[in-house]
Amino acid sequence: MAGVSLYGGQDLPMLDKLTIESFEPHVGTSFWLHTENRKIELRLTRAAKVMESEAARLARTPFSLYFLAPVLLPQQIYRLTHDGFAESLDVFLVQIAGDAGGFTYEAVFT
């Protein structure tokens, strides 16, 4: 996502610049999770605002992203890439559900 200039043009890390609006156009598209020896496709299924009542005191409105993956992964920080973002994203993913259709992971941004 080249040219992101939020927060008055301050030089912030990529993740600190992103808002829910950065991800909403990408719901339904594929992100790629990179491990040492494989690349796994994740589908962004939903982007949702959280803690609306406390958002006024924060630099951005907190939000969660929900991804569907074909494999079970331990909760940890993963490197994600997407064609719509110029830089890779290091995101903490937690598995919140799973069934025959795959495993759902959540990433929370505050």
Model-derived regions: residue spans:
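A glycine-biased structural micro-motif
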Residues: 20, 25-28
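Short, compact, well-ordered microdomains
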Residues: 77-110
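A generic structural signal for short beta-strands and their flanking turns/coil linkers
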Residues: 27-29, 38-40, 59-63, 74-76, ...
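Short, conserved beta-turn/loop elements at beta-strand boundaries and strand-helix junctions
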Residues: 48-53, 97-101
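Acidic, aromatic-enriched beta-alpha/helix-loop junctions
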Residues: 52-84
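Conserved hydrophobic positions within beta-strands
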Residues: 44-46, 93
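Short, Lys/Arg-enriched N-terminal segments with co-localized hydrophobic residues
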Residues: 2-13
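Short coil-to-beta-strand transition motifs
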Residues: 33-43, 82-89
